[in-house]
Swiss-Prot record:
Pathway assignment: One-carbon metabolism; methyl-coenzyme M reduction; methane from methyl-coenzyme M: step 1/1
Residue ranges of coiled coil: none
Domain of life, per lineage: Archaea
Organism of this sequence: Methanococcus vannielii
Listed name of the protein: Methyl-coenzyme M reductase subunit gamma
CDD domains per record: MCR_gamma (cd00539)
NCBIfam families: met_CoM_red_gam
Gene Ontology CC annotations of this record: cytoplasm
Family: Belongs to the methyl-coenzyme M reductase gamma subunit family.
Cofactor stoichiometry and binding remark: Binds 2 coenzyme F430 non-covalently per MCR complex. Coenzyme F430 is a yellow nickel porphinoid. Methyl-coenzyme-M reductase is activated when the enzyme-bound coenzyme F430 is reduced to the Ni(I) oxidation state.
GO biological process: methanogenesis
């Protein structure tokens, strides 16, 4: 019998949203169309139209020793061409943002190849070959329901603000003011790249989601939304993991896991 992954425990809407993010067969809703060159501008690693910098020759030109693993694993296009590794980093507001750091890392590892993810309490960075990074940053991370212009921020540095209250326009605090709310259009405009360097022209990333939409798709448990304690299966799994880590440590024994 084929194994059917559960991805995440729980019966609440938040648990369902987390499962959807982690399930590669689930198609995330596309909400906007940000031009490729605008994503490149926000990331700030190269100018639109500029050639990709490389760190080694194309793989087909390299004389490498035989390796069974290399023969089994199809390299990413960026690896084939020798493109350098670059990053994109997101901060997600605790006020019902669609995604959050651990959710991002889990879905990156499941849905993507050739990535390295770093997870902190209020930000999440992912690294990859530059050309591949640009492709999935647009199509997966910014054009879909994973991104809300007001409560999700592309922030390569000075990420603070994820735990602060939203402003009158529903915008998450940003010490570098990388993006602003345009009251005329109702859209969010990036005026700086992810590390705070001013852009020549503002980049329009669309209008913020309504709070009702955020509450519907968020992966964040909140007491004033859907509390984690209302989901018995999630609590059971979290307690089991915590107990196993606390008592088992680096030397897990059968006695430790009895009754878990």
């Amino acid at each position: 019998m084929a194994y059917k992954p559960q991805f995440y425990p729980g019966a609440t809407k938040v648990a369902e949203n987390r499962r959807n993010h982690l399930n590669p067969n689930y198609e995330l809703e596309k909400l906007r169309e940000i031009p490729d060159e605008d994503v490149v501008k926000i990331m700030g690693h190269r100018q639109p139209g500029e050639d990709y910098k490389t760190v080694h020759p194309p793989l087909e030109e390299m004389d490498m020793p035989a390796d069974y693993v290399r023969d089994l694993v199809e390299p990413l296009n960026g690896a084939k061409e020798g493109h350098r590794v670059r990053y994109i980093q997101f901060a997600d507001s605790m006020y019902f943002a669609p995604a959050q750091p651990y959710d991002r890392s889990r879905l990156y590892m499941i849905r993507l190849r050739g990535v390295d993810a770093g997870t902190l309490s209020g930000r999440q960075v992912v690294e990859c070959r530059e050309s591949d990074l640009e492709e999935f940053s647009k199509n997966l991370l910014m054009d879909t329901e994973l991104f809300d212009p007001a409560t999700s921020g592309v922030r390569g540095a000075t990420v603070h603000g994820h735990s602060l209250r939203l402003d009158e326009n529903g915008m998450m605090f940003d010490a570098l003011q990388r993006c602003v709310f345009d009251e005329k259009t109702g859209h969010v405009m990036y005026v700086k790249d992810q590390v705070g360097k001013p852009l020549d022209q503002p980049v329009d990333v669309g209008e913020p989601m309504p709070e009702a939409k955020l509450r519907e798709i968020t992966t964040i448990y909140r007491k004033d939304g859907i509390a984690m304690r209302t989901d018995p299966e999630v609590i059971e799994v979290v307690k089991r993991i915590h107990r196993a880590r606390t008592l088992g440590g680096y030397i897990p024994t059968n006695e430790i896991f009895k009754g878990l």
